[in-house]
Amino acid sequence: MHQNPRLILASSSRYRRAMLERLRLPFESISPDVDETPQAGEAPAALALRLSVAKAMAVARLHPGCIVIGSDQVATVDGQPIGKPGDFARAKSQLRQLSGRIVEFHSALAVTDGQRTEQADVITYCEFRPLTDAAIDAYLRAEEPYDTAGSAKAEGLGITLMESMRSDDPTAIIGLPLIALTGMLRRFGLDPLRSPS
């Protein structure tokens, strides 16, 4: 009887866990111990890819024989990274800055079995509509998106702040690009549509 290898999500993010649950594959979530400090001159896409691989490898080293998923997301406007605001004041300032502008989200993904690693970067372009202070305040009070880069949760009320969104994978904006991920998992022998044997 063939058994699928154990699947691990190298993340403590509840958003990524919820996304992976959609694939109906059994998995566990383990928080990786990775320094997320950007390197000098590192481009946002390179940072997201490096961190996704580092997270996957950090967990894979401790769990040989498992398939490990690492991911990271970096948001930028005009090439400058936008972090997680942490509190109301910084979130308000961030949303004022993003009003009427396009934000580029790099959602990087790495899958490894410890021997071989695949990676991808899925880009999402979000155009924010012009935002009034009243709209910003109402949104922040309703959703408190202080742990989200760009201060807007597209999977929730944050979608009301958007004018448009472009991406090859509509799930990428939430931080785990499922279209790219399912292709990678199939190449590692895990297919969500195939019953475990």
Swiss-Prot record:
The species this protein was found in: Bordetella avium (strain 197N)
The keyword Membrane appears for this protein: no
Annotated site residue numbers, Important for substrate specificity: Y15, Q73, E155
Gene3D superfamilies for this protein: 3.90.950.10
Enzyme Commission code(s) on record: 3.6.1.-
HAMAP family: Maf
Active-site residues (renumbered): D72 (proton acceptor)
A Gene Ontology molecular function term of the record: nucleoside triphosphate diphosphatase activity
Protein name: 7-methyl-GTP pyrophosphatase
GO CC terms of this entry: cytoplasm
Presence of the UniProt keyword Cytoplasm in the record: yes
Family statement drawn from the similarity comment of this UniProt entry: Belongs to the Maf family. YceF subfamily.
Coiled coil region boundaries: none
Cofactors required: a divalent metal cation
Catalysed reaction, written as an equation: N(7)-methyl-GTP + H2O = N(7)-methyl-GMP + diphosphate + H(+)
Subcellular location as annotated: Cytoplasm
Residue pairs linked by disulfide bridges in the UniProt entry: none
BP GO annotations: nucleotide metabolic process
